Amino acid sequence: GLHGEFLPASKRYLNDYIQYVTSDFLAGLGFGATQMLGETEGIYIGYSLDTGRNVYLKPALASQGVKGSVTNALAAAFVGSLGGGKSFSNNMIVYYCVLFGAQALIVDPKAERGRWKETLPEIAHEINIVNLTSEEQNRGLLDPYVIMENPKDSESLAIDILTFLTGISSRDGEKFPVLRKAIRAVTNSEERGLFKVIEELRAEGTTISTSIADHIESFTDYDFAHLLFSDGDVTQSISLEKQLNIIQVADLVLPDKETSFEEYTTMELLSVAMLIVISTFALDFIHTDRSVFKIVDLDEAWSFLQVAQGK
């Protein structure tokens, strides 16, 4: 009977080995069942080892709402083991997209792309590398009130950053309303900056507001924290006019993947906070000139996706 079970159209003779599985398991069985990979034209990214056919990719296709396209998901992730070629594949696709007319913004926290102007001379004139150091000339460039154009967006980002740094939850009925009120007052004023939030909290004069102000001010003692805080007098901003823009932040100290949020050091908190600001700014960049295909490339995205504000 057990042998007969393997014959097509045969009945089941033994019920001891039945496995109840989910739809995910069944879907996993179908992986590799087809040889259809990529598009019929586009960027050449490799070939199939089984068939020898070239594989082409058109990253802009999903964003155009083309009739008959299989997916309209705009996000893509590169996952794999260390040294598996994730960064190389990512860089290659971004590079070719720029050659095809796209505009790209890469958030490069590990500063691995600092020599692209020298190594890619054919497009050097269209590469803009923004290296944010702790020098005085860069003071306040990552302040939410400086980097975001819309005051409401600045206010929302300021809340995310300050609640992230201080650990104040929106469910905290005592501290959160006080912090929210101070940020709203700064948003409605003429001079906007995170240092002004500290001044508003001190002007409140209560024990809770003073405690929050002291907590926020304690972060400003670090040199590269000056990127996040301004007095509202910063007039310059980060320019993204070139085809390929790379934002690097020097001295970032990113936590290990295994480190829980509660175990983050002060430097790690500030580093992730800066990545949250830059990433929010990068996503805002997508909404400019919708006629141009744009790419926002978030390297080391896991570091800020581990916390609620980063997500």
Locate predicted features.
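Helical/strand "switch-coupling" subdomains that flank nucleotide/phosphate-binding cores, especially
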Residues: 133-236, 241
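Walker A/P-loop NTP-binding active-site region of P-loop NTPases
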Residues: 80-143
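Conserved P-loop NTPase motor cores
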Residues: 61-84, 89-95, 107, 111, ...
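Generic, well-ordered alpha-helical scaffold segments in large soluble proteins
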Residues: 81-84, 92-100, 116-119, 123, ...
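Short acidic, S/G/P-rich loop/turn micro-motifs used as interaction or catalytic elements
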Residues: 169, 252-254, 303-305
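Hydrophobic positions in the central parallel beta-sheet of the AAA+
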Residues: 245-247, 296
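Basic- and hydrophobic-enriched, low-structure N-terminal and domain-boundary segments
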Residues: 1-75
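Conformational switch/transducer regions in large eukaryotic molecular machines and scaffolds
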Residues: 235, 250-252
